[in-house]
Swiss-Prot record:
Reaction catalysis annotation: L-histidinol phosphate + 2-oxoglutarate = 3-(imidazol-4-yl)-2-oxopropyl phosphate + L-glutamate
SUPFAM superfamilies: PLP-dependent transferases (SSF53383)
Keywords: Amino-acid biosynthesis, Aminotransferase, Histidine biosynthesis, Pyridoxal phosphate, Transferase
Organism whose genome encodes this protein: Burkholderia pseudomallei (strain 1710b)
Record field: transmembrane: none
Positions where N6-(pyridoxal phosphate)lysine occurs in the chain: 217
Subunit-structure text: Homodimer.
E.C. designation(s): 2.6.1.9
Annotated pathway: Amino-acid biosynthesis; L-histidine biosynthesis; L-histidine from 5-phospho-alpha-D-ribose 1-diphosphate: step 7/9
A molecular function (GO) term: histidinol-phosphate transaminase activity
Annotated InterPro entries: Aminotransferase_I/II_large, HisP_aminotrans, PyrdxlP-dep_Trfase, PyrdxlP-dep_Trfase_major, PyrdxlP-dep_Trfase_small
Protein name, per record: Histidinol-phosphate aminotransferase 2
Transferase as UniProt keyword: yes
One GO biological process term: L-histidine biosynthetic process
Length: 356
């Protein structure tokens, strides 16, 4: 009898699936989601739009109206093209697949977004992690040395970084781009609505840079839409490994509709930026808590015992992310999403119990 062990790659057999906990009944502050629903009139209008979507037809592979709207709203340079993905996760997988030549490597600062390493492993690429400094800032000298030593195919720079919230200095990013002449530098701006800084306007100035974004953190995590901006010479190659019809018709219609009303989402992002400042101050005042600077919609917090804090919050029905085992630099760290005022109040009340 044939078994999975006879067929599946050994490295895949040794892996575990990406864990997504059941959040039913919890204050959900573990996944950097926008806590705000659409205003009722806008939600009703969206429902009316979606009711007329042709569900019996395959989606357009390059929906012109949606791409034009993305260009207009985000200021995509005229010389750049746009490639859509089923979330940025799919785009990361496509990049790895397209670049998976024998001996090719992927390089990124660590701790960082886990999908950079996972996608490299799935494509059988070597992943090179360059540790941040102890204060979780970028070690530019180590990055430049690693670029010279490994000459990776792909270099990921999360701007800002997840899970640390670090926003790397522009001059360091420029030095990395210049040093990565043999690489493609992918600047991941998933949290741009909260960082208020971007490399997208400069995407056409470099022949080895693409900028990746997602609609998820802006408030549309449920529709799964990511997009890659870069020179056509790059995007035409990545498009070859894109699954046909990868972005469904409901996602396309919802994204186009909401980009026409992006001021609502932008206002929500502004609320969360203000709440981030207040929440960081309040958590930082608790005994034993150290809050790291963040340019995302989340805070990284070091506590005396991350596992104990996580367990107390679970008891209080507040779900956060215990990242303390992800990397040695994250010892006793938890990551909390900035939520609504009510959610933040619940979080603070639970943290006061965990950090008396």
């Amino acid at each position: 009898m044939t078994t999975p062990e006879d067929i599946i790659r050994r490295d895949v057999l040794a892996m575990t699936g990406y864990p997504v906990p059941d959040a039913t009944g919890f204050v959900k502050l573990d996944a950097m989601e926008n806590p705000y629903s659409l205003p009722a009139p806008l939600a009703a209008e969206l429902g009316e739009r979606l009711a007329h979507v042709a569900l019996n037809r395959y989606p357009a592979p390059r929906p012109a109206a949606l791409i034009d709207r993305l260009r207009a709203v985000t200021g995509v340079p005229a010389a750049c093209d746009v490639l859509l993905g089923n979330g940025s996760d799919e785009l990361i997988s496509m990049l790895a697949m397209a670049c998976a030549k024998p001996g090719a490597k992927v390089l990124a600062p660590v701790p960082g977004f886990v999908m950079y390493e996972l996608s490299a492993k799935f494509a059988q690429l070597e992943f090179v992690g360059v540790p941040l400094r102890a204060d979780l800032t970028l070690d530019i000298d180590a990055m430049l040395a690693a670029l010279a030593e490994h000459r990776p195919a792909l270099v990921y720079l999360a701007y800002p970084n997840n899970p640390t919230g670090t926003l790397y200095p522009d001059e360091d990013v420029e030095r990395i781009i210049a040093a990565a002449a043999a690489s493609l530098v992918v600047i991941d701006e998933a949290y741009q609505p909260f960082a208020q800084r971007s490399w997208l306007p400069r995407a056409a100035q470099f022949d080895n840079v693409v900028v990746m974004r997602t609609m998820s953190k802006l408030g549309l995590a449920g529709i799964r839409l990511g997009y890659l901006v870069g020179l056509p010479a790059w995007l035409v190659q990545f498009d070859k490994v894109r699954p046909p019809y990868n972005v469904n018709v409901l996602t396309q219609a919802a994204a186009e509709f909401l980009l026409e009303r992006v001021d609502v989402l932008d206002a929500q992002a502004a609320q969360l930026r203000d709440a981030r400042t207040a929440l960081a101050h309040a958590i930082g005042a608790l005994p034993g808590a150290t809050v790291f600077p963040s340019a995302g919609n989340f805070l990284l917090v070091r506590v005396p015992d991350a596992a104990a804090v996580f367990d107390v919050l679970l008891t209080e029905r507040v779900l956060i992310k215990n990242v303390s085992k992800m990397h040695p630099l994250l010892a006793n760290c938890v990551r909390v999403t900035v939520g609504s005022p009510e959610e933040n109040a619940r979080l603070l009340a639970a943290l006061k119990l965990a950090l008396p």
